From Swiss-Prot:
Protein name in the entry: Formate channel FocB
Catalyzed reaction equations: formate(in) = formate(out)
The encoding gene: focB
Regions crossing the membrane: 36-56, 69-89, 113-133, 164-184, 191-211, 249-269
Family to which the UniProt record says this protein belongs: Belongs to the FNT transporter (TC 1.A.16) family.
Keywords associated with the record: Cell inner membrane, Cell membrane, Membrane, Transmembrane, Transmembrane helix, Transport
Organism encoding this protein: Escherichia coli (strain K12)
Pfam family, one: Form_Nir_trans
Length: 282
C-alpha cells in the first residue's frame, strides 16, 4: 500500500528525471534506428490527420462539436506514437534536456532533430502517396479533398507572429501531454492523460509543423494535379486557393510554426521543468 501511495504521489522532480533519461536514450540510438522510428511517427501523424479530415469533411466548420470530435479523432495519431515509441520532431525537441545535462553537444542535438524531421517527412510522403492513389480525395463527392483544401488554406493567412505563437501553444500542449503520460502506470493511463491536451490544440487551431507537412503539401498537390472531375464535384477551381504554393507554405507557415514548436517544447517545457526540478542535481 505504501509503495502504491508513493507512486501516486511521486514528486514532479521524478517525472523530470524520467524525461531526462528518455531524452538521453533517444539521442543514443543509431541514426538508422532514429530515422526509421521517425518515419513511423510521420505515418502515424498522417493517419491521425486523415481521421480528423474524414470526420470534418461533410460538417459545418463553425460547429464547436465538430472541432471537438475532430480533435478527439486526431489524438489517434499521438496514441499510436505513445504506444509504438516512435520519434516525432515536436516531441523530440525535448531531448534538449540531455544537452543541458552535458550528455550531448549542440551539434549532436541538432543532427538528431534534423534526422527526426527528415524521417517524419519521409513517412508522411509515403502515406500521402497511399491516400492519393486510394482515391480518397474523390470520396463523398470530393468533400474529403475539399476539406483538405479549406483546412490548408486557412493555415496560410496567419502573420509571422501569429504562426509562431500558435506553434508555441501547440507544442506546449503536445509536450505537456507527453509529460503527463509519464505519470501513467498502464497504457490506458498514458492514453487518457494525453487526450485532452491534444484535443485542445486541434480544436483551438494551434499549429503543428509536422501535421502541416501532411495537410498543406497534400492540398498543394490537389490544387495542381486534381483531375477536372474533382473540381466539377467540388463546384470550385484551383484559382480559389491562390495561397497554396510551396514557397508561401515554407515562408508563411512551416518556418515560423517550426520555430514556435521548438520554443514551446524545448524552452517552455523541457528547460523550464529542468530548471525547476533538476537544477541542483550534479
Amino acid at each position: 500500500m505504501r509503495n502504491k501511495l508513493s507512486f501516486d504521489l511521486q514528486l514532479s522532480a521524478r517525472k523530470a528525471a524520467i524525461a531526462e533519461r528518455i531524452a538521453a536514450h533517444k539521442i543514443a540510438r543509431s541514426k538508422v534506428s532514429v530515422f526509421l522510428m521517425a518515419m513511423s511517427a510521420g505515418v502515424f501523424m498522417a493517419i491521425g490527420f486523415t481521421f480528423y479530415l474524414s470526420v470534418i469533411a461533410d460538417a459545418p466548420s463553425s460547429q464547436a462539436l465538430t472541432h471537438l470530435v475532430g480533435g478527439l479523432c486526431f489524438t489517434l495519431g499521438f496514441i499510436l506514437l505513445a504506444v509504438c515509441g516512435t520519434s516525432l520532431f515536436t516531441s523530440s525537441v525535448m531531448t534538449v534536456m540531455a544537452k543541458s545535462r552535458g550528455v550531448i553537444s549542440w551539434r549532436t542535438w541538432l543532427i538528431n532533430a534534423l534526422l527526426v524531421a527528415c524521417g517524419n517527412l519521409a513517412g508522411i510522403a509515403c502515406f500521402s502517396l497511399l491516400i492519393w492513389f486510394s482515391g480518397l480525395v474523390m470520396s463523398e463527392n470530393a468533400m474529403w479533398g475539399v476539406a483538405v483544401l479549406h483546412c490548408a488554406e486557412g493555415k496560410m493567412h496567419h502573420t509571422f507572429t501569429e504562426s509562431v505563437s500558435l506553434g508555441i501553444m501547440c507544442n506546449l500542449m503536445v509536450c505537456l501531454a507527453l509529460w503527463m503520460s509519464y505519470c501513467g502506470r498502464s497504457l490506458c493511463d498514458k492514453i487518457v492523460a494525453m487526450i485532452l491536451p491534444i484535443t485542445l490544440f486541434v480544436a483551438s487551431g494551434f499549429e503543428h509543423c509536422i501535421a502541416n507537412l501532411f495537410v498543406i503539401p497534400f492540398a498543394i498537390a490537389i490544387r495542381h494535379f486534381a483531375p477536372p472531375p474533382f473540381w466539377q464535384l467540388a463546384h470550385s477551381s484551383a484559382d480559389n486557393f491562390p495561397a497554396l504554393t510551396v514557397s508561401h507554405f515554407i515562408t508563411a507557415n512551416l518556418l515560423p510554426v517550426m520555430l514556435g514548436n521548438i520554443i514551446g517544447g524545448a524552452v517552455l517545457v523541457s528547460m523550464c521543468y529542468r530548471a525547476i526540478y533538476l537544477r541542483q542535481e550534479p
